[in-house]
A protein has these predicted regions:
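Conserved helicase motor "Helicase C" RecA-like lobe of SF1/SF2 P-loop NTPases
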Residues: 474-498
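A substrate-engagement module of RecA-like helicase motors
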Residues: 2-16, 66-194, 257, 289-295, ...
């Protein structure tokens, strides 16, 4: 059956799916995907919000009968595809291939680590014990081991790190529970499936494993579809680099202690070596200073106190290595700990070998933890080699792939020159549904107290807004300033990112209907609030990355060395993509109405402002905040 027939008004999709009506851009995308699948090669599709891109790639992918891997940028979309969209489409096509959902290892219960924690329960904190009871009770009945399903457990609960595994602490085939391992079972299902739904992190983890020559995590396929593909460059960069973090070090120190008690309690030096490792990790964190932050590792290596703390950590790692070497053969936990300390020693040397070219060496330090990172400046060559497989189709789609209607930036980041391209506008009527305002008399982007000034400037608009409002900020400092003023001055519920987890904040926002949510980057994308609950999106300034970001600095320097223009080639495109994501929160349906306010004068008084405007949907623009109230009045009358 042809794609056109499947999408016809009297076709199988319309007959099976209530309210389904094919849109012209959706059909155009589906036909392009079908051609790519038939001929192989690469296809880039920017599909505006409301295009219906999920069905546009699912239908031809399933109709092809080939093995398909679909990768998403978020677990939410991954689950939506598997539990909602795939059953709908397979039902409409009367075709039920074996399908599988596969997540990364941190999503699955590790039976061995849970049982080890139970055996050491007398050593645990009360809050860990309370959650351990929930985990154990749930583990008896679960059929997939997905820890996201544990009832009554916070999504960031401390216990999750203790009952899931990492690449470092997994015992692999030496584990006594290997045959019952939830992760192993999930991977087996995926290997037997025709359609596998994964996420981008898992795709790149699989590439990293294949590079080592030790098997694979994701089955080979004939068709790969990447939804939310704009996230790929950043995720790829993280996976093709290396890192050493204090969490990993302290987790290893704890596991050495447990192995000492369980398998070699006569070797007191094991316990002492583990203590020394944990203390050395904590000392290195303190050497970063109270504020922490991000920076260049080369700069830290020049500081004597930091160098001394690093030397103590190296000594502690060396001691653990020698003591564990003496304990080899006394137990599986000890043998595995020796493998991990060997890997840690090697990796620490790699992230500190700061004289290699083509990499950024940087650290990220929070209140309690640090990470030392080695990150490649470009992943284009490595990724391009991956997508050259003959007779394999690669489809990349998102609402935000282009800058000024061109794919150049995305193609350069991933080495996708020569790909077929398709840009599809949103079917929404932005002329009727939305207004864009860049107000006059704005404070400068780096003005002192800017958050307070913006909040006071926006109060009349927020009060006039019939529904809810997102106030999206580019820094936590401005976010807190805005929230403080709004809570003092307006009679609405003001929700603040960080005061509760993301899902509960969104739930309260939607249920309230007139709340203001003040947030930063994590709410710029992947949020779908339809109807009047979100009628206004305010963006504090253009989302340029901080010039102090060590990875950006390294890329800027590299671009200059090659004779390029780092602002035009790096900073501007990334800011445009980020702004398009933030703007995309506003209109999610044909019946939505709302206003978008961008509080940055550079949109109109800098030459590059035109690039931002041309990259956004064709929303009628104004500079007068006061006119937005009449837009709301008109839309309310129409309703």
């Amino acid at each position: 059956m042809t794609i056109q027939t499947l999408f016809k008004p009297d076709g199988p999709l319309a007959s099976h799916i209530d309210g389904f009506k094919a849109r012209a851009p959706q059909l155009e995308m589906a036909e392009a995907v079908a051609r790519a699948i038939k001929s192989g090669g690469r296809l880039l599709v920017e599909a505006g919000t409301g295009t219906g891109k999920t069905y546009a790639y699912l239908v031809p992918a399933l109709e092809s009968g080939k093995r398909v891997v679909i990768s998403t940028g978020s677990k939410n979309l991954q689950e939506q595809l598997f539990y909602r969209d795939l059953p709908t489409i397979t039902g409409a096509l009367s075709y039920t291939p074996p399908v599988a959902l596969l997540k990364g290892r941190s999503n699955y219960l590790c039976i061995e680590r849970m049982n080890r924690l139970l055996s050491e329960s007398h050593l645990q904190k009360p809050e860990i014990l309370n959650d351990l009871v929930k985990v154990k009770s749930w583990s008896i009945a679960t059929d997939n081991g997905d820890v996201g399903d544990i009832p009554g457990l916070q999504e960031n609960a401390e216990i999750l790190a203790h009952v899931t595994s990492t690449n470092d602490n997994c015992l692999g085939r030496d584990c006594p529970y290997y045959d019952d391992c939830h992760l192993v079972v999930a991977r087996r299902r995926a290997m037997d499936a025709q359609v596998v739904v994964i996420n981008h992190h898992l795709f790149f983890a699989d590439m990293a494993v294949k590079d080592t020559g030790f098997g694979e995590l994701v089955p080979q396929a004939q068709v790969y579809v990447f939804d939310e593909a704009h996230q790929l460059p950043e995720i790829a960069t993280n996976y093709f680099g290396k890192s050493v973090g204090s969490r990993t070090i302290q987790d290893l120190a704890q596991d050495i202690q447990l192995a000492y008690r369980a398998e070699a309690h006569d070797m007191a030096q094991l316990g002492k070596a583990a203590d020394r490792l944990a203390i050395a990790s904590q000392d290195l964190r303190l050497a970063f200073g109270v504020d922490g932050g991000r920076g260049n590792t080369r700069d830290m290596l020049r500081q004597p106190l930091w160098g001394q703390a690093l030397a103590r950590l190296n000594d502690a790692i060396g001691l653990c290595y020698e003591v564990l070497k003496l304990a080899l053969g006394r137990g599986e936990q000890l043998d595995h700990a020796f493998e991990r300390i060997s890997e840690l020693r090697t990796r620490l040397g790699e992230v500190l070998a700061v004289n290699q070219t083509g990499f950024s060496y940087w650290y990220d330090c929070s209140r309690l933890h640090f990470t030392l990172n080695l990150t490649p400046l470009s992943v284009a060559e490595r990724f391009s080699a991956e997508v050259q497989r003959p007779e394999v189709a690669w489809v990349f789609t998102s609402a935000t792939l282009t800058v000024d209607m061109r794919f150049d930036h995305f193609k350069a980041e991933l080495g996708l020159a020569g790909s077929a391209e398709l840009i599809l506008d949103s079917p929404f009527d932005y002329g009727e549904q939305a207004r864009l305002c860049v107000p006059r008399y704005l404070p400068e982007p780096n003005a002192f107290g800017r958050g307070e000034q913006l909040a006071n400037l926006m109060i009349p608009l927020i009060n006039k807004t019939p529904g809810g409002c997102f106030f999206l900020c580019t820094s936590h400092q401005v976010m807190r300033q805005v929230a403080e003023v709004l809570r003092r001055e307006i009679g609405r519920t003001v929700l603040l990112q960080g005061e509760d987890n993301k899902q509960r904040l969104l739930k309260e926002f939607v249920e309230n209907g007139r709340a203001v949510l003040v947030a930063t980057s994590s709410f710029w994308e992947g949020i779908d609030v339809r109807g009047a609950a979100l009628s206004c999106v305010i963006i504090d300034k253009l989302p340029f990355a901080s010039p102090d970001d060590p990875l950006l600095k390294a890329r800027v320097d590299d671009c200059k060395l090659k004779g390029g223009d780092p602002f035009a080639e790096l900073q501007l495109p990334k800011a445009v993509i980020a702004l398009k994501q933030g703007v995309g929160r506003l209109i999610r349906d044909r019946t939505d109405h709302g206003v978008l306010v961008i509080c940055d004068p550079r949109m109109v008084n800098k030459p590059y402002g035109a690039t931002f405007i041309k990259s956004l949907p064709a929303i009628p623009r104004t500079r007068e905040l006061g006119t937005l109230g009449s837009f709301f009045d008109r839309t309310e009358r129409c309703e």
